[in-house]
Every structure is written in structure tokens, then in C-alpha cells.
Amino acid sequence: ATELGLKVALLDRRSHIGGNAYSENEEQTGIEVHRYGAHLFHTSNERVWEYVNRFTDFTNYVHRVYTRHDGVVYPMPINLGTINQFFNAAYSPAEAKALIAEQAGELAGTDPQNLNDKGISLIGRPLYEAFIKHYTAKQWQTPPEELPASIISRLPVRYTYDNRYFNDK
């Protein structure tokens, strides 16, 4: 709009702009408070990255997520490190892909009707039950067997040791 000399009207239902990315300085301390949680911006679109960098500086941050299963901590999303640690193995990427395909084939030839079966058909029962099933039930407050399969279309599995949650900027 600035480059074209256009005017923009911005409407927000809240008393401030910024949506969930809103932050404000706390009066007494001057500390910036993120009212709706931490702000993580990431994109793989170079034009978007260049555009937003015209307006602000970004702090380099790599988001990593870990989960616990049976008292052991694993990196997420599921990657080659997760697979090898979980199965106490040293699979190559090709071997890990073959293992997951074999385990996911348990429901081959069926049309998954719920999230539970869809998850198993995507990554196999062992990984699904260890890392997805209970988290999903907690997140949705509903057993995965009662959730529609359409909720998940894929479960990311990386066949590298890259354990960054987002693999873009």
C-alpha cells in the first residue's frame, strides 16, 4: 500500500491490532509482555521474509520440541534420531523408511474412518501409540477412535537427524 500510495483500513475485534501476535510493555517494569503467548514467525517464502524484515528485526531462534514416552525423552517431530532411539537401532534413512512403511501397512487396503486408524496407517502402530495417540486425546479431550480421520492428513516423519520443529526461516 505504501509503495502504491494506497490507504488501508485495518479492523480488529480486540481493542488493539496484532491479533495473537500482540505484545505490550508492562507499565511498571517496561518488560514486553506477549499477551497471547510467544510469537514465532516462520516462512519458507523468500518474498514474505524480505517484506516483513522491512518493518522489524528478528531474533534468530530455532524451535525444538521434545516429548517423553516411558520415562525417555525423544525429539519431535519424529525424525531419524527419534526412530533409532525408540527402536534401539541404527537405521539408515532407507531402512527407517522401509520399517515405517511396513508398520504403516498394517491397515493397508482399508479406508481409515477415525484418527486412530489414520495415524496407524501413516506411521505404524508403535510410533503412533508412543507419540501421537495420547497427545491427541489430551489435545482434543476425545479418544482418537472417536475423532474423524480428516483431522490429520499426514504426520511428518523426517528421515534425517534434523530435529527443528520448523525447517524454514
Predicted regions and their residues:
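Active-site/ligand-binding neighborhood in enzyme catalytic cores
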Residues: 70-72, 80-169
